[in-house]
């Protein structure tokens, strides 16, 4: 289950609302705006990660995302750079897979999420890595996230497997828990640090 029911209807994404703008659009070198898309199997907690990051909330009883949801959040990094994330949370159900390229086209960041208790979701994460390598922007920042780290007693995907997949594909890896908020802010802070910076104007 996702956290989609906690998101207002006005934030639901539609195809007409998609933008193919630049991957990261700076107002200046210290103010960045970037389109971020979350990909992964249904039920891995993509919406819960977004809701925890944007609103500091967690809803274990919510419904799955249908289509896609849109939210935005701005953070300040230690170097005084501000990053505005325009976050597209895509549906994980198989019938929506064909729509995913419409959401990650033009994205500067892709966050691929799997559930550490679900080997099947890890296989799907590998699929999304390949899809992004084929069709994503060449300079896209990619993160691999093993979610539900609080369920360590039910773990079926070793941490080492996630680390290996990320290392092989030039991604960074982190394990999170949307339920406890563990590593959620750290995930987005690390993404912000890895975004390309515009050259200073002369």
Swiss-Prot record:
Location of the motif Effector region: 62-70
Family matches, as NCBIfam families: small_GTP
Membrane topology reported for the UniProt record: Lipid-anchor
SMART domains (alphabetical): RAB, RAS, RHO
Processing and modification events after translation: Although this sequence lacks the C-terminal cysteine motifs subject to isoprenylation in other Rab proteins, it does have N-terminal N-myristoylation and S-palmitoylation.
Superkingdom of the source species: Eukaryota
Entry GO MF terms: GTP binding; GTPase activity
One GO CC term on file: cytosol
Localization: Early endosome membrane; Endosome membrane; Cell membrane; Endoplasmic reticulum
GO terms (BP aspect): early endosome to late endosome transport; endocytosis
SUBUNIT field: Interacts with VPS9A. Interacts with TCTP1.
Coiled-coil annotated spans: none
UniProt gene name: RABF1
Family according to the record: Belongs to the small GTPase superfamily. Rab family.
Lipidation residue positions, type N-myristoyl glycine: 2
Tissue: Widely expressed.
Principal place of residence: membrane
Residue positions bearing lipid (S-palmitoyl cysteine): 3
Protein name (record): Ras-related protein RABF1
């Amino acid at each position: 289950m996702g956290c989609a029911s906690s998101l207002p209807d006005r934030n639901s994404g539609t195809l007409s609302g998609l933008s193919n703008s630049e991957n990261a659009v700076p107002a200046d070198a210290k103010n960045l705006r970037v389109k971020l898309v979350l990909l992964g199997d249904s039920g891995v907690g993509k919406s819960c990660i977004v809701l925890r990051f944007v609103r500091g909330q967690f809803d274990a009883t919510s419904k799955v995302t249908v289509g896609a949801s849109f939210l935005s959040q701005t953070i300040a990094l230690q170097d005084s750079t501000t990053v505005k994330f325009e976050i597209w949370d895509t549906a994980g159900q198989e019938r929506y897979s064909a729509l995913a390229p419409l959401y990650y086209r033009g994205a500067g960041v892709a966050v691929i999420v799997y559930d550490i208790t679900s080997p099947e979701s890890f296989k799907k994460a590998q699929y999304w890595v390949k899809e992004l390598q084929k069709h994503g922007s060449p300079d896209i920042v990619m993160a691999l996230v093993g979610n539900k780290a609080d369920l360590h007693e039910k773990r079926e995907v070793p941490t080492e497997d996630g680390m290996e997949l990320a290392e092989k594909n030039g991604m960074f890896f982190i394990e999170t828990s949307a339920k406890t908020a563990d590593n959620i802010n750290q995930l987005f802070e690390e993404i912000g640090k890895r975004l390309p910076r515009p050259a200073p104007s002369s």
